[in-house]
Structure formats: C-alpha cells, structure tokens
Regions:
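Conserved donor NDP-sugar-binding/catalytic core segment of glycosyltransferases
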Residues: 1-30
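Catalytic donor-sugar/metal-binding loop of nucleotide-sugar-dependent glycosyltransferases
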Residues: 69-70, 77-79, 83-97, 103-124
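Active-site-adjacent helix/loop segment of glycosyltransferases
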Residues: 103-107, 111-173
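Short, flexible, basic/aromatic active-site loop/helix in glycosyltransferases
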Residues: 33-71
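Short, hinge-like loop/turn segments at secondary-structure boundaries
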Residues: 29-35, 133-136
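Short linear elements at protein peripheries
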Residues: 13, 56-80, 162-173
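Residues that scaffold the ATP/ADP-binding catalytic core of kinase and kinase-like folds
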Residues: 28, 38-42, 88-89, 108, ...
Length: 173
C-alpha cells in the first residue's frame, strides 16, 4: 500500500480490504452517508424488501476485488494517510469522540485527494458493533451523527450527491 501511495501523489487516504475473522468481506468502504440511508440502515426490519438493495449501494458491495476504487468513507479500523494530506486537511475533529470521526476526515481529505480502497491487501478486523448492543454507545452514535450532519448538511448536500454519483459510476465500468 505504501508503495502505491508513494507513486500516486493524488491519493491522500487509503484502506485495504477488510475481512471478518472467518475470511468473509466486511463492507466497510462506503458512500458518503445521508440521513436517509442511515435511517434505512438502522430500521432494516421495517424496510425489509428494499434493505438489501440500499445496503448493496451504500456499502459499495459491487466493488471488484481486482480493482482499486475511490470511496467516500474510509473506515478508521485501518487507514493509511498521506502526511501532506493530514497537514493540509487536519486530523480527527475533536467534536467526534467515536463514530463519524473517520467519515468526517475521509470527506475532508477527499476534497483535495483521492480516497481509495486497495483490495490487493487484506486485514482481519473483529467488528464489535457496540452501538447496537448498548444504549450508551447508541447515544454516542446519535450524538456524533448529529454533529456530522450539522457540520456537512442534513438533506441538501450537493457535494455528497456529486461524490456519491461519481463513486457509483466507477462501479458500473
């Protein structure tokens, strides 16, 4: 990954393919989130019929394992940053204790650099999903969600729409 980043100065942030301990892919690179998508994701039992279609799109599940893809949201579980990108865009925003800190930083870096998933390297990640198991963690999730959308815009976010359209278009090629 480091060799790739060094030879591609337009890349500011990248992540490898992330696997569950059983070897199955975790769909952690995602589009830039919208409130609608997060509500649909959380209420999957209500939106049963459309849920898989929405999640396939949001989680970019059609990303190929043999192709580098630009993504809107790089998971904080494993990220490789270009130092210059951090100097230019800043580091983690202190408003986000947990949840959305990686989403916010991905978005800021993407304004100036490419943010990519590099599927030729894999790492294993034990996913805890704490926000669905604890009211305290869920309340932190909701607080961070509100902080994120207060910062970037709730429903009318032209930048998010343009970026997500670009990310999805590359998957069609």
């Amino acid at each position: 990954m480091l060799t790739y980043m060094e030879s591609h100065p337009d890349v500011g942030l990248m992540m490898p393919r992330i696997l569950h301990p059983n070897g199955k892919t975790q769909f952690l690179p995602k589009l830039m989130p919208s409130p609608k998508m997060l509500i649909q994701r959380r209420l999957r039992s209500v939106f049963r019929t459309q849920h898989e279609t929405w999640m396939t799109k949001f989680e970019m599940r059609s990303m190929r394992d043999d192709q580098i893809s630009e993504v809107g949201n790089i998971s904080g579980c494993f990220s490789l940053f270009r130092t210059e990108a951090l100097k230019r865009c800043g580091t983690y925003d202190e408003r986000f204790f947990m949840y959305f800190e990686d989403t916010d930083l991905s978005r800021r870096i993407h304004q100036h650099y490419k943010t990519i998933c590099f599927p030729f390297v894999s790492v294993y990640h034990l996913y805890g999903n704490a926000a669905s198991k604890s009211w305290r963690m869920f309340s932190i999730f909701i607080y961070s969600l509100c902080q994120y959308f207060n910062k970037w815009g709730w429903f009318f976010d032209k930048e998010r729409n343009q970026c997500n359209a670009k990310f999805l278009k590359q998957l069609d090629n």
